[in-house]
Amino acid sequence: MKLLFLCALIALTAAAPRQKRLTVGTIAVSGGAGGSTGCVVTGNVLYANGFKLRELTPIEQQELQDYQNKVADYKATLKQAVKERQEKLKARLAGKKGKAVETSSEELPKAPKKPSFCSPDDTTQFYFDGCMVQNNRVYVGNTYARDLTPSEIEELKVFEKKQTVYQDYIQKQVQQQVSNLFGSSDFFSSFFGGGEAKQTTTTEAPELPEEAPEQPNVPNFCTPIY
């Protein structure tokens, strides 16, 4: 019975409206995970999620050059750090004494900050029934249709804010129901093993606001014909 209820909760979460899709904006670099997702620059032309935006200004071109240099240093430093960890691990497996291999990511180098011309405003995509909005531009399929009007831009900002609050509430609601259903028991251990569950640290269910947030009205930027 619990399993059936859990499946129903998962289905409820999946069915919750998700008109917004955030695509993380990163510039594709040689040797990394390339593709057209996020920001890509070629020939001093900026693309976001495969859509051409504009040409970089001279200042942005210099910023891109600085970023490329930092990426090269980052990749070299990361490669060396990984190599050192591998050598330490091999030494431990061979029975040699030495400092234990640290697993904390704090010792690993951090990736350089993205250039200013690749921001979430450029790469966030809002999928509606019939069209997609990115960077305040409406696309039908992969074809640019039009720019949003100033009033529509404001409407989209309000929708994004309310939709984020609403989706956060739905997720917390599901987490709370799952926590109330299974309590502090190790559900998966009891379900699969049938033996004595291991002692685990339980996470308290998130508190929900007294009043549920209202689901925002979806902006009407395009009209599909059925």
UniProtKB/Swiss-Prot annotation:
Bridged cysteine pairs (disulfide): C131-C222
GO terms for cellular component: extracellular region
Domain of life of the native organism: Eukaryota
Family per record: Belongs to the protease inhibitor I33 family.
Protein name: Aspartyl protease inhibitor
Signal peptide residue numbers: 1-15
Pfam families listed in its UniProt record: Pepsin-I3
Gene Ontology MF, one: aspartic-type endopeptidase inhibitor activity
InterPro entries on file: Pepsin-I3, Pepsin-I3_sf, Protease_Inhibitor_I33
UniProt function note: Aspartyl protease inhibitor.
Claim: Nuclease is one of the keywords in the record: no
Compartment(s) of residence: Secreted
Species for this entry: Parelaphostrongylus tenuis
Tagged with keyword Transcription: no
